UniProtKB/Swiss-Prot annotation:
GO terms for biological process: positive regulation of DNA-templated transcription; positive regulation of transcription initiation by RNA polymerase II; regulation of transcription by RNA polymerase II; transcription by RNA polymerase II. This is Mediator of RNA polymerase II transcription subunit 4. One of its GO terms (cellular component) is nucleus. The keyword Transcription applies. It comes from Rattus norvegicus (Rat). Component of the Mediator complex, which is composed of MED1, MED4, MED6, MED7, MED8, MED9, MED10, MED11, MED12, MED13, MED13L, MED14, MED15, MED16, MED17, MED18, MED19, MED20, MED21, MED22, MED23, MED24, MED25, MED26, MED27, MED29, MED30, MED31, CCNC, CDK8 and CDC2L6/CDK11. The MED12, MED13, CCNC and CDK8 subunits form a distinct module termed the CDK8 module. Mediator containing the CDK8 module is less active than Mediator lacking this module in supporting transcriptional activation. Keywords: Acetylation, Activator, Coiled coil, Nucleus, Phosphoprotein, Transcription, Transcription regulation.
Length: 270
């Protein structure tokens, strides 16, 4: 009787537990079903052991415990199927999460490329607006084609793209000497022995005239007097260089009279 009463109490407890199993998650329900199966199996084994030792038949109680065990096993199998389905769904969710991460990475890459393209387009639009402003400004201050052609002809005629620092309107000089100017210069005459002025000497006619050749002509007005004086030939006589101080015509007459007297006295002595 004690065994039967304990079995009834166990059944009531198992019934209460089985009623509470529908409230939790699948994992909790599986654990609860396993605990119920463990308790029922232990109870059934104890009942079989007691009946064998006492040689008492308790078929009704054993059948009830066995039915509960079979019922809980069915619940456990259903929960296992549910868990397997949920496991498949979980794997699908993980695969979808990986796909979402991949798509998110692709979207971020595309977003980065779109930002770069936006920056490039913004720069291009800004430059285009600046060009349009320049075009509009050029249209407002347009220059006739004839003036442009004249200016281009003037540049091409001078064979130059940059004028000297001292260049003024009307100055025909170029920023560099031409081949003809180089040949007619001092260096060209030094390299050519057939011309006068070889070995660095100036032509005789230029020295005799007291002037400089065109190659050595001063470029500035303040240089003309100094360079003319410095470049005079050695045999060129000037009053301010060769005549001593106080020299005049009367001194010359006195010298001539003295020379005449000395010559006459020498003739008388003879």
């Amino acid at each position: 009787m004690a065994a039967s009463s304990s079995g009834e109490k166990e059944k009531e407890r198992m019934g209460g537990v089985s009623g509470m199993t529908g409230l939790g998650s699948t994992r909790e329900r599986l654990l609860s079903a396993l605990e119920d199966l463990e308790v029922l199996s232990r109870e059934l084994i104890e009942m079989l052991a007691i009946s064998r030792n006492q040689k008492l038949l308790q078929l009704e109680e054993e059948n009830q415990v066995l039915e509960l065990l079979i019922h809980r096993d069915g619940d456990f199998q259903e929960l296992m199927k549910l868990a397997l389905n949920q496991g498949k769904v979980h794997h699908e969710m993980q695969a979808l999460e990986k796909e979402v991460e991949k798509r998110d990475s692709d979207i971020q890459q595309l977003q980065k490329q779109l930002k770069e393209a936006e920056q490039i387009l913004a720069t291009a639009v800004y430059q285009a607006k600046e060009k349009l402003k320049s075009i509009e400004k050029a249209r407002k201050g347009a220059i006739s084609s004839e003036e442009i052609i004249k200016y281009a002809h003037r540049i091409s005629a001078s064979n130059a793209v940059c004028a000297p620092l001292t260049w003024v309107p009307g100055d025909p000089r170029r920023p560099y000497p031409t081949d003809l100017e180089m040949r007619s210069g001092l260096l060209g005459q030094m390299n050519n022995p057939s011309t006068s002025g070889v070995n660095g000497h100036l032509p005789g006619d230029a020295l005799a005239a007291g002037r400089l050749p065109d190659v050595l002509a001063p470029q500035y007005p303040w240089q003309s007097n100094d360079m003319s004086v410095n470049m005079l030939p050695p045999n060129h006589s000037t009053d301010f260089l060769l005549e001593p101080p106080g020299h005049n015509k009367e001194n010359e007459d006195d010298v001539e009279v003295m020379s005449t007297d000395s010559s006459s006295s020498s003739s008388d002595s003879d």
